[in-house]
Amino acid sequence: MLSVVPSPVLVRAPSKVNLHLGVGDLRPDGYHDLTTVFQALSLGDDLRISPASALTVKVNGEGAAEVPTDRTNLVWKAAVRLAHLVGRAPLVEIVIDKGIPVAGGMAGGSADAAAALVGLNELWDMGLGRDELSALAAELGSDVPFALHGGTALGTGRGERLLPVLSRNTFHWVLAFAKGGLSTPAVFAELDRLREHGDPPRLGDPQALMQALASGDPAQLAPLLGNDLQAAAVSLKPELRRTLRAGVTAGALAGLVSGSGPTCAFLCESADAAVAVAAELAGAGVARSVRTASGPVPGARVIDPES
């Protein structure tokens, strides 16, 4: 009897921007308590997952050489974890086409891990629900559960405990990618250092920001955007100050460093305004490249190869 080889599965993984990122003091276990509001954005990575004779991970696109393709990659770990759960060997090839900047503060690695869970669940016909996949996602990393769910959400703990947040509009963003990345642990360590030597401003409660999201008004949302890690990212990469100024000068409503950086995200009034801001930023020479994106969008999901 002939066995049927499953067709490859294509999965889209969204990037994210932290609209609010409040960072608590360093805990004894080396982590920080976070209060964050995530929004999933249309800029994303695509993963193609196919049956193979051995587990392999391949990466294409800008920054591909900086992404490990061995067992240290979160995608590799996701495949091994899911295969172990069902008692099978992880015999798949996973090809990642990068759209999310590497080490850019937009959770590209976490998004890819979430996409791997979704794609393998489909390829292997496991029938796992989102809650079961979420539990696996939380074991892989604190940003992976949000990449799985997408939309807009409030994250607490290390960011892995999620509550959906009502967002009544599509918000339009311009993303300025910096030359070179920033290490997330290095940015947190720099924040700890800055706090030891002074008292950089800390964000308060995100309630007003969540009300602005529910209103759907970007002008109401703009002044409420904030990131406790921004001071540390700018301290390590001072040229980000110029990028942030340039985006607002170009017409953005507000700008902030995304997550641990160094990508800068600019909220705009409309899709047309975002195109205009992106064009001006691209000509200003303050970023390696510039993209537009919108959100919120769904989390990691299987897509039609033709889409």
Swiss-Prot record:
Q: Catalytic center at which residues?
A: K16, D143
* Chemical reaction(s) catalysed: 4-CDP-2-C-methyl-D-erythritol + ATP = 4-CDP-2-C-methyl-D-erythritol 2-phosphate + ADP + H(+)
A single Gene Ontology biological process assigned to it is: terpenoid biosynthetic process
Annotated keywords? ATP-binding, Isoprene biosynthesis, Kinase, Nucleotide-binding, Transferase
E.C. number(s) listed in UniProt? 2.7.1.148
Q: Name one GO molecular function term.
A: ATP binding
What does the record give as its pathway? Isoprenoid biosynthesis; isopentenyl diphosphate biosynthesis via DXP pathway; isopentenyl diphosphate from 1-deoxy-D-xylulose 5-phosphate: step 3/6
The record lists ATP as bound by P101, V102, A103, G104, G105, M106, A107, G108, G109, S110, A111
InterPro entries, alphabetized: GHMP_kinase_C_dom (IPR013750), GHMP_kinase_C_sf (IPR036554), GHMP_kinase_N_dom (IPR006204), IspE (IPR004424), Ribosomal_Su5_D2-typ_SF (IPR020568), Ribsml_uS5_D2-typ_fold_subgr (IPR014721)
Give the family from UniProt: Belongs to the GHMP kinase family. IspE subfamily.
NCBIfam families listed in its UniProt record = ispE, PRK03188.1
Q: Which PANTHER family match?
A: 4-DIPHOSPHOCYTIDYL-2-C-METHYL-D-ERYTHRITOL KINASE, CHLOROPLASTIC
Role, per record: Catalyzes the phosphorylation of the position 2 hydroxy group of 4-diphosphocytidyl-2C-methyl-D-erythritol.
Q: Can you say what this protein is called?
A: 4-diphosphocytidyl-2-C-methyl-D-erythritol kinase
From which organism does this entry originate? Nocardia farcinica (strain IFM 10152)
